[in-house]
Amino acid sequence: MNKRRANGSSHSTRPVRTGSPKWVRFSREEVEMLIEELAKKGYTPSMIGIVLRDQYGIPLAKPIIGKKVNQFLKDKGLASQIPEDLFNLIRRAVNVRRHLNEYPGDKTAKKGLEEIESKIRRLSRYYKRVEKLPQDWTYDPAKAELLVSASS
């Protein structure tokens, strides 16, 4: 019954491989340097992976550097305080709230905002449980708008 709000299932299947492909020309140090440069430019971990794949021909960073991009950024102190998926939901909620200020009669957008904020609360509860967020962290729309505008 809850199909409307379900996440999509369309995706490609990753090939099963333990090491890095033979045709990748970059060494471990070069890939680490690329990831650091992209992170300092403000790219998110998923965008770093897309840039590495599309512009440099590196299908996955993990077999080359031995860690996931997010873990590498955390070790270097370049990871963000709020997990990327939660931050993207917060950004969506801020955009929908901005839309509702302009068009207050949009009932569909109101329902969408309720669903997004519900998802934010569920995800934040999970991140508190696994200690990726501080226990006193709460979602506040006013603070969320400041957070999103500061990161832009």
Swiss-Prot record:
It comes from the Archaea. Residues 1-20 are annotated as: Disordered. One of its GO terms (molecular function) is small ribosomal subunit rRNA binding. Belongs to the universal ribosomal protein uS15 family. Gene3D superfamilies: 4.10.860.130, S15/NS1, RNA-binding. Keywords: Ribonucleoprotein, Ribosomal protein. SUPFAM superfamilies: S15/NS1 RNA-binding domain (SSF47060). InterPro entries: Ribosomal_uS15, Ribosomal_uS15_arc_euk, Ribosomal_uS15_N, uS15_NS1_RNA-bd_sf. One of its GO terms (biological process) is translation. SMART domains: Ribosomal_S13_N, Ribosomal_S15. This is Small ribosomal subunit protein uS15. GO terms for cellular component: cytosolic small ribosomal subunit. Part of the 30S ribosomal subunit. It comes from Metallosphaera sedula (strain ATCC 51363 / DSM 5348 / JCM 9185 / NBRC 15509 / TH2).
